[in-house]
Amino acid sequence: MSTAKLGCPKLRIMPLSIPSFPLPDARGRYGRFGGRYVPETLIPALDELEQAYEAAKQDPEFLDELDRLLREFVGRPNSLYLAERLTEHAGGAKIYLKREDQNFTGAHKINNCLAQALLAKRMGKQKIIAETGAGQHGVASATAAALLGLSCVVYMGEEDMRRQSLNVFRMQLLGAEVRPVTSGTATLKDATNEAIREWVTNVRDTFYILGSVVGPHPYPAMVRDFQSVIGEEVKVQLQEKEGRSVPDAIVACVGGGSNAIGIFAPFAYLPEGERPRLIGTEAAGHGVDTGMHAASVAWGRVGVLHGSMMYLMNDDEGQIVPPHSISAGLDYPGIGPEHCYYSVMGMAEYVPVTDAQALEGLQLLTRLEGIIPALESAHAISYAVQLARQMKPEEIVVVNLSGRGDKDVTEVMRLLEQSENKQAEGQEVKA
């Protein structure tokens, strides 16, 4: 029996036209943030990309094909799930999970990768390159490349390859070449550096699929637009479940910030008083006072990285301070320019969550709901429980569960065993 006969409304994945937002301005800026800080050789490529994107998002054929693939290949719409036992544990507001972990490839990254790969093919490019930290963007890029018949090279820090060996094999199985990066801290920032270097060299036939809302214009806007399907679905699904389209608060983890912007942006420009609290959880690592963290808003200063002005973790001489996070996907020393604008304008809050709190959040959701979240998402879960506890039962918190935790199980096992060994040693010393 069709959904039409059952009287169920069809939830279109992409609107008839991609949502338009007030920012960026014509120079690609969000207030003082964003812009294009790149070599002259890249300006024509960025202009070409911007023109191609503007044309594509007005093209019904492009939108219909993206809509079809998001439905039939990715599996959208995914669930807006009431976490009843987690809600009961918190003892306050209802906690809903936006289940990006249900997407094919296991995270929100595929929303953007599939769209950019379609754009690459439309532009006549034959090869895509990508950077990856946790490996999810790399897997999604390799998946989109395999689907559309494009070659794919993924740059990944050597340290992240160790932490995410399963995703490395997935990329290789999909036909991608994974190139290890050993420079710097051998993590996401360094992988991005190498990907940009290759793009500069091979810009004629190569398309760079940037995975987050960072980089030079038009990347932050383009990635936001492709990820905004998350927030647009929440509006429709919450209306069906609760009779209202706007929750009281939305919580999402933030590294560069693509999953967070995807759920924030459709709500961020609502008038004050109608806008929900938007809360991004940054990776506080061992604590923001230790220097071992990746909390760019809490600790950073304005600077330029990867072609964009943003809050950065830099020292008095302007040098990048190596970030740290238990999660490879949050291990980035900056945050996207639109998030910086939200913070300055008071449109969103950004709070630090430590490694230990994220591990607790992961175990809590796993044991109460049977859902193993990605370590990145666990930062948001941890804070959402604290937040819900302070709210009223009739209020609603939506958490963007940005990805599943399969990729992290080996690392979590190692960390928990390490913690247990330390506790045992401490008990023996006390004894």
UniProtKB/Swiss-Prot annotation:
Source species taxonomy: Bacteria, Thermotogati, Deinococcota, Deinococci, Deinococcales
Recorded GO MF terms: tryptophan synthase activity
Function: The beta subunit is responsible for the synthesis of L-tryptophan from indole and L-serine.
Family label: Belongs to the TrpB family.
The keyword Amino-acid biosynthesis is annotated on this UniProt entry: yes
PANTHER family per the UniProt record, alphabetical: TRYPTOPHAN SYNTHASE, TRYPTOPHAN SYNTHASE-RELATED
Protein name per Swiss-Prot or TrEMBL: Tryptophan synthase beta chain
Cited Pfam families: PALP
GO biological process per UniProt: L-tryptophan biosynthetic process
Description of how the protein assembles with itself and partners: Tetramer of two alpha and two beta chains.
Pathway named in the protein's UniProt entry: Amino-acid biosynthesis; L-tryptophan biosynthesis; L-tryptophan from chorismate: step 5/5
Residues the record lists as N6-(pyridoxal phosphate)lysine modifications: 109
Regions annotated as coiled coil: none
GO CC annotations, alphabetized: cytoplasm
Catalytic activity, as annotated: (1S,2R)-1-C-(indol-3-yl)glycerol 3-phosphate + L-serine = D-glyceraldehyde 3-phosphate + L-tryptophan + H2O
Entry keywords, A to Z: Amino-acid biosynthesis, Aromatic amino acid biosynthesis, Lyase, Pyridoxal phosphate, Tryptophan biosynthesis
UniProt xrefs under PROSITE patterns: TRP_SYNTHASE_BETA
InterPro entries: Trp_synth_b_CS, Trp_synth_beta, Trp_synth_beta/beta-like, TrpB-like_PALP, TrpB-like_PALP_sf
EC number in record: 4.2.1.20
Requisite cofactors: pyridoxal 5'-phosphate
Keyword Plastid part of the UniProt annotation: no
Organism per entry: Deinococcus radiodurans (strain ATCC 13939 / DSM 20539 / JCM 16871 / CCUG 27074 / LMG 4051 / NBRC 15346 / NCIMB 9279 / VKM B-1422 / R1)
